[in-house]
Amino acid sequence: MSDTPLRIAVTGVTGRMGKEIVTCIVKEEKQFSQEIVLGAAITRLNTNICGMDAGILINTDALGIEITDNLESIKDNFDVLVDFTAPDISIEYLKFCVNNNKNIVIGTTGFNQIHKNIILNASHKIGIVFSSNFSIGVALISKLLHKITQVIGNTSDISIIETHHNRKRDIPSGTSLTMQNIIVNALRSIHSNRIIDSNLDSTTYSPASSYKDILIHSIRAGDVVGEHTVLFAGPGERLEITHKASDRLIFAHGALRAAFWVGRDKIGLFDISDILEMDTLL
């Protein structure tokens, strides 16, 4: 391991997650043994704050790092880029990282299949941690879902209920789609009844396969950070698995843990389960 702290570039610093990640790096560096530091603060939508010290943005002392919208000007100032923005913008940042041999953590959701193919191709050249949710709790639930579905999936009606704040753009949430795909793959392995869902890519899921109907119910209300419940309803009983996020700090911690894990040298496509080494669980 290098003795030099890992320098993190954060995009979308005026957004909810961008600001949270900057705050986490600066104010909670002890959690990471001071092995990561803020290297760059990037914006695209709020160019009027370019030149402002990033410390002012999070109400702390000046950090000596100016917010910028010019990637070329800061390409030598960071090792890993952490991105929670929007799909098209994320792809631009990804291409920049590929061209400059920088690893990237992507927490953006709402990607289409073309975007996902670009991410996959880029992972042959750089290290990418790509996850719809960087909460450890959600990662554990995702691991449990596969096992539970294998046991009771073919005798249950399965639904996913997700609730987020009223400014969240993508419906359904990326996390709920990830959960749905985990359940679908588990059902495929036990040859269950047919699944009908317009969100699923017909090129990925064969019409000849048989699945159960899995519905996603989305709620957008107030300032809810994020809640996900998976319901397995069977004869005489039901099982509900719920995760409730009350603070975006958990996502910031997870993303920075991912950045530290992928570091400067790893190449490939990874997700939160790789970082937590969850293949050894259950």
From Swiss-Prot:
Q: Which domain of life is it from?
A: Bacteria
| Compartments, record wording | Cytoplasm
UniProt source species:
Blochmanniella pennsylvanica (strain BPEN)
Class in the EC hierarchy, top level: oxidoreductase
The cross-references to Gene3D superfamilies, in alphabetical order and at most eight, read: Dihydrodipicolinate Reductase, domain 2, NAD(P)-binding Rossmann-like Domain
The keyword NAD is annotated on this UniProt entry: yes
* Reactions mediated catalytically: (S)-2,3,4,5-tetrahydrodipicolinate + NAD(+) + H2O = (2S,4S)-4-hydroxy-2,3,4,5-tetrahydrodipicolinate + NADH + H(+); (S)-2,3,4,5-tetrahydrodipicolinate + NADP(+) + H2O = (2S,4S)-4-hydroxy-2,3,4,5-tetrahydrodipicolinate + NADPH + H(+)
Primary role: Catalyzes the conversion of 4-hydroxy-tetrahydrodipicolinate (HTPA) to tetrahydrodipicolinate.
The entry sums up its family as follows: Belongs to the DapB family.
Pathway connected to this protein: Amino-acid biosynthesis; L-lysine biosynthesis via DAP pathway; (S)-tetrahydrodipicolinate from L-aspartate: step 4/4
EC assignment: the record states 1.17.1.8
Q: Which UniProt keywords apply?
A: Amino-acid biosynthesis, Cytoplasm, Diaminopimelate biosynthesis, Lysine biosynthesis, NAD, NADP, Oxidoreductase
Instruction: Cite the active-site annotation.
Output: H164, K168
Please identify the protein, giving its name as recorded: 4-hydroxy-tetrahydrodipicolinate reductase
Give any Gene Ontology cellular component. Answer: cytosol
